[in-house]
């Protein structure tokens, strides 16, 4: 058994008999009390996020998860279709299982699918950064450059993000899929 000192963000653990993803955690030692670890956990079955306090050094059960790289094929409503490039096996993943990064998935891009017990899908980990084309962008008004001016643009996947005023329609931008933030313009 592992202890709370082995915790890492995005780790899958079994807590109270159910599978949870560690969203965040931190060690807290209040004055003359015993140290504790405060964990924010996302239940993989219900999707609910809870905050739990456990004594530092408590035993936790880390679940072994298999990551398989798969190619994103297409989206059909709220269902995303992925294919294993070695076996050509196709799977369907509901949008709520992917979460916020779903809006940055581009067709034919690779993503890691997390499996438990060989066939149960736990989630999808898209690449940390993706390069997408800007399909719609408002024109920056001359004279609005006294401060850092951001504008909203629509990307080829339909996602809307905030970018600096110099980004125009047709430009390629790099986006962080974890936060949805603009990183840089690609030339």
Curated annotation (Swiss-Prot):
It comes from Roseiflexus sp. (strain RS-1). Disulfide bonds: none annotated. Pathway: Protein biosynthesis; polypeptide chain elongation. It is found in: Cytoplasm. This is Elongation factor P. The gene is efp. One of its GO terms (biological process) is peptide biosynthetic process. GO terms for molecular function: translation elongation factor activity. Belongs to the elongation factor P family. Its main location: cytoplasm. The keyword Protein biosynthesis applies. Keywords: Cytoplasm, Elongation factor, Protein biosynthesis. Involved in peptide bond synthesis. Stimulates efficient translation and peptide-bond synthesis on native or reconstituted 70S ribosomes in vitro. Probably functions indirectly by altering the affinity of the ribosome for aminoacyl-tRNA, thus increasing their reactivity as acceptors for peptidyl transferase. GO terms for cellular component: cytoplasm. Pfam families: EFP (PF01132), EFP_N (PF08207), Elong-fact-P_C (PF09285). InterPro entries: Elong-fact-P_C, NA-bd_OB-fold, Rib_uL2_dom2, Transl_elong_fac_P/YeiP, Transl_elong_KOW-like, Transl_elong_P/YeiP_cen, Transl_elong_P/YeiP_CS, Transl_elongation_fac_P. NCBIfam families: efp (TIGR00038), PRK00529.1 (NF001810).
